[in-house]
């Protein structure tokens, strides 16, 4: 285990939330699977304090890059709890998708997120789809666009599918992107314009 990883894992137990958050962010970048168990333990403790939502977000995002599919049951339970914070549900959707992708089961993970009806969770999953540049099969793409287009074009749920669609194909996708270009949100229009040109742009999650 690299020295940087060992030190970051140690700091997950620091009394300071800011230092724990910094450690989680570093582990997210390092993407070392040896940190997965420590991150899961730290996250279980962290979610007990709603004041540390930023730290919870970073730990959840880090679990998505350092964890394993065996962490999915805990993550899925966490993100559907009624008291789980908005930021953690966003990161949870991202992490569920990433860990599922390790087993090539991301289409099932997307459908699971869609079935919850939680726009925040779905947005997190689509954020990961965009960052991983995943091509989706036609059925999954249709399910995603049905979910998104049932919402107002003013809704932020449109942004990440507009980015991710750079790697999708089909008439439905083209119609969605064309609609986004003329829609009310400038960020979505910009992302859709790039996707129509086959470019993912340089967007990054928080």
Residue ranges and their predicted role:
Residues 15-17, 47-52, 82-85, 117-119, ...:
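Short inter-helical turns and helix N-cap capping residues of alpha-solenoid HEAT/ARM repeat scaffolds
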Residues 1-11, 30-47, 68-81, 101-115, ...:
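Amphipathic alpha-helical scaffolding segments comprising HEAT/armadillo-like alpha-solenoid repeats
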Residues 16-19, 39:
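A short linear-motif detector with a strong N-terminal bias
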Residues 1, 10, 18-33, 53-68, ...:
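Structural detector for internal amphipathic alpha-helices that build alpha-solenoid repeat scaffolds
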